[in-house]
Amino acid sequence: MATTTAGRVRTVTGTAVLAALVLVIAFGNPAYTDWAKNHTANDAWGFFLKQLAWPTWSFSSDESVRTILANDIKAVLLIVLTGVFVSLMVDSAASRSGRLFFSSWGAYLFAGALAGLLAAFIQANASLRAAFDWAAGGAIYGLFVGWVLAVVVFASRR
C-alpha cells in the first residue's frame, strides 16, 4: 500500500520502520536509559518512561562485550523485524481503518518479542529462561509503546 504525495511514495512499512528507528534512537540511547532508570517515579508514568528505554543500545559500557553486543543487536533487530512484521500483517486495503492501527501495533509487539528472544542468546551466560525474559520484555515494550508507532502509521495515511 503506497500513498503518493508530491512525487514521493510513502508506504506503511517505510513509515513504521522510520518510526521504530526514531523510537530506538531517541529513547534507547545511553543518556535517556540512565535518566529513566535513575529519575522516574515508581508509578504508571514512570513505568511507561522505563519501557521506552527497553531497546537500549550503547557503544561503551561497564557490562561485558557480549551483553553490549546483544543489546545493540536487539535494537537493530527491533527495527528490521518491525518492517518484516508490518509488511506481513498490514493489509493493503486497510487505509485509515482500525485494522491498520491494530495490525501495526501488533506487528511492533511481535517484533519486540522476537528481537528480545533472538538477541538474548548472544549475551553472556545465555539461557532459555533469560531468552524468555528478554522476549517478555520485548512484548511488554511492544504493548505499551507500540501504540505510538501505530498512531504514526495511522496518521501517515490520508
Annotate the PLM regions.
Residues L23-V24, V86, A119:
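Structural signal for membrane-spanning alpha-helices in multi-pass inner-membrane proteins
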